[in-house]
Amino acid sequence: MAPSWMSFERERIKSNMIIGFRAFIDFERPSQELIEAYRSLPSANIGDCCYKMNCMFDGIHSFNDIPLCGPAFTVKVPAGDNLVAQLALDYAKPGDIIVIDGAGFTNRALVGGMMVTYAKEKQLGGFVVNGAIRDVDDIKNSPIPVYGITQTPLGPYRSGPGEMNVPVCCGGQVVMPGDIIVGDHDGIVVIPQKDADELLQAVRKNLDHEQTEMKKMKSGQYTLQDHQKEFLEKFLKNGGVFK
């Protein structure tokens, strides 16, 4: 059962609905079929098909080496305060990725072992934190994927304000509610929901082409120099240097 203070804050955020302290609970999510299609695709290939424009910076990394894929449930909080991030766990749906914009502040943790344990009970899809986490040992033993910048023993404030399901900035990328978040050992890529169907076909084609080239390289039929030459000629042609 949620503590009494949380019930009070839940009602307060629902009644305020002013900039800085508001919650938008309902938003469109991509189909489960589309999410599952992306789950098996490497973040690097997805990033390549976005011209490397949709990848979060390398400071945000996995703390328990578990890949993630799901719709973004965005949270925006002041530096070092996780009141609204905690409240978000009650509103998020199974499979949602809690994307927390903590402005990159790392002196206080925004997510810890208790929140991750609760997320497991709620069957959430994971956390991506533009800030710090703590209780690393608990997180390493959890099946819930957790990505963040660093760790600290210092806990957060719980004073507010904050916002749910507004545009946020995380790892240098704008994330909208419902965008598909894919994370693995290489990092995290953000897929705008409106582009997800079209991008999927491009990523599959890119991956097939890459795997074919890898097979040729392993058999000695194709060298890295061949690949570089082919890429360079294509680049120069697209740039108008070659006709």
What are these model-derived regions, one by one?
Residues 3-177, 191-243:
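Feature captures the catalytic cores and cofactor-binding loops of soluble hydro-lyases/lyases
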Residues 181:
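C-terminal binding/interaction regions
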Residues 184:
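Beta-strand-loop-alpha-helix segment that lines the small-molecule cofactor/substrate pocket
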